[in-house]
Amino acid sequence: MEEGLQRMKETPVRHDAVKRVSCKKRWYARTANPKYSVVAIDCGMKMNIVRMLNKSGCNVTIVPYDTSYEEIRFMNPDGVFISNGPGNPEDVPEVIRTLQKLRGEVPMFGICLGHQLLALAYGAKTYKLKFGHRGGNHPVKDIETGKIEMTSQNHSYAVDDASVEGTPLTISHINLLDQTVEGLTVKEDYVFSVQYHPESAPGPQDSTYLFNRFIQNMEAYREMINRVG
């Protein structure tokens, strides 16, 4: 027993989890009669996310996690999606730097790890939970509407609520079990994120409306750009 514990302590912690699960090259998922073009930053993305974006009328270009800001801007997307993925968000500073440069230039939607990465890009901090959130029955409250959603979760890190103060971020959702941050928004930048998995299948379907919100943000941003010329 003691020998096993010692071996566990001596095992080095890997910091390349996202690198190991992200796609190695760009690929495409097209849909009939597309209305929007989305770049999805793959940090370990589930295929059901791609299906839901396609179903919402989006052509999706899936890119490796370390795709540069310049490459993404060259694709001229209507929106950028930042996916779920494993590990500590601070282990992928290249994604954080890219998101910092994209702030205010394109609507963005992040889930799970993508949520944490957007938080860091806007100046908030993250920390490791004593007990990670796992399973498909986590109650989350939408602060603006008061609605309670049952959500699917699988993460070990969370956004520090105190660190949000003084940033452009607003907390939009909280976990009713431990009051941790479950959602963030920057309305003036058409950016929002959630800690849980709205695409979960099988799993609760309470939060699939978030994909519609992403579509609405892209449409609103497009209209705003057209107005200002």
Model-derived regions: residue spans:
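Active-site-proximal beta-strand elements of phosphoester/diester hydrolases
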Residues: S37-D42, T151, F192-Y196
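Catalytic beta-strand/loop cores that center a nucleophilic Ser/Cys/Thr
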Residues: K147-D189, I225-G229
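Residues that mark the start of a beta-strand
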Residues: K35-V39, N59, P107, M150, ...
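Hydrophobic residues at beta-strand termini and immediately following loops
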Residues: I41, V63, L129, I174, ...
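RNA-binding accessory domains that recognize and position tRNA/RNA substrates
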Residues: M1-E70, F74-N76, P89, A201, ...
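A glycine-centered loop/beta-turn motif at secondary-structure junctions
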Residues: G183-N226
